[in-house]
Design a protein with these regions (language model features):
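Acidic-and-aromatic substrate-binding clefts and catalytic sites of carbohydrate-active enzymes
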Residues: 12-17, 33-46, 63-71, 94-103, ...
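Charged helix-capping and loop-helix junction motifs
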Residues: 20-21, 71-74, 101-110, 137-142, ...
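Alpha-helix-loop-beta-strand connector modules within alpha/beta enzyme cores
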Residues: 47-63, 112, 116, 142-149, ...
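Acidic/histidine-rich catalytic cores of soluble enzymes
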Residues: 118-216
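Glycine/small-residue-rich loop that forms an oxyanion/phosphate-binding "nest" at active or ligand-binding sites
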Residues: 70-108
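N-terminal pre-domain/capping segments
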Residues: 1-86, 152, 253-265
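H/E-rich (His + Asp/Glu) clusters that bind or coordinate divalent metals
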Residues: 203, 208, 215-224, 231-236
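Conserved beta-strand positions in the central sheet of alpha/beta enzyme cores
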Residues: 5, 35, 60, 88, ...
Length: 265
């Protein structure tokens, strides 16, 4: 079984008030891993020590976020302090709007990838729903991959449905060779999403989500078809219809008690 982690963006409102306390609660639930998206005014070295003290680890981070070749020096330095060999990139809907946009985005990504590779880092792409829209019947993400064939993917299974238009298991199979980890959220896949914006450098797409196992995402089928290359299953609930800490604990219990992921308890 793959280890289970939680994307700390899910707990951002609590982290703003008591970041060390949030990390302790995550460890107490039994999560093996965390994936940060911001360090809440904690130095990278201090954050790394906090994880070590709590017996937590991470295989990836959404901090720092690779946005251009010009920022990669700082990005690599932070990743090194965090003891990571992977760096994340991701985009706005406008970056995938047209064929020309996709090509330009892929070319920029390939440039960053080349620099990172020379320095011992792997670049991975985190998706939302819009990459799984189609142009002339072809997935935009497939077009992106053609122009940037070396890129690795952190597949967000819920978003890969493109709001209920695609089969997430089929999407996983299509990109199985590129997948390095999985983001798992749950909810009613077919819903409208509006109000997209950037908040503290992170793409925010308001969506109604639920604890894992209570929505319409075929989680058991996804885990059964997960490629060996996936290092971890990371729970991420951008929003939730119930208290977030409760949802994170319920999601952990669902995954571990059903033998879908490995935790510490």
């Amino acid at each position: 079984m793959k280890p289970i982690g939680v994307q700390l963006y899910s707990l951002r409102n609590l982290a703003e008030k008591d970041f060390p306390g949030v990390l302790k609660k995550v460890a107490d639930i039994g999560y093996k891993l965390v994936e940060p998206a911001g360090l809440w005014n904690v130095r990278p070295s201090e954050f790394r020590k906090m994880l070590d003290d709590l017996g937590l680890d991470m295989v990836s981070s959404h901090t720092p976020w690779a946005r251009s070749s010009a920022s990669l020096g700082e990005v690599m330095e932070i990743a090194h302090i965090l003891k990571l060999d992977k760096v994340v990139c991701g985009y706005m809907p406008a970056n995938f709007a047209t064929l020309d946009d996709i090509k330009r985005t892929a070319e920029d990504t390939a440039k960053m990838q080349e620099i990172l590779e020379r320095n011992g880092f792997t670049l991975f792409q985190h998706n939302h729903d819009f990459e799984f829209a189609r142009i002339d019947g072809k997935l935009k993400y497939e077009i992106f991959r053609e122009y940037c064939p070396k890129v690795k993917i952190q597949l967000d299974c819920f978003w890969s449905t493109n709001l209920g238009k695609e089969d997430p298991v089929e999407m996983m199979k299509i990109f199985s060779k590129e997948i390095i980890s999985i983001h798992m959220k749950d909810g009613i896949c077919k819903q409208d999403v509006s109000g997209t914006k950037m908040v503290n450098g992170i793409l925010e797409r308001p969506v109604d989500l639920m604890p894992l196992g209570t929505g319409s995402l075929p989680i058991k089928d996804l885990v059964a078809n997960m490629p060996e290359s996936a290092e971890a299953i990371i729970v991420e609930l951008d929003y939730c219809i119930i208290d977030m800490l409760t949802a994170i604990e319920q999601s952990y219990t669902y995954m571990v008690s059903n033998g879908l992921a490995a935790g510490n308890k």
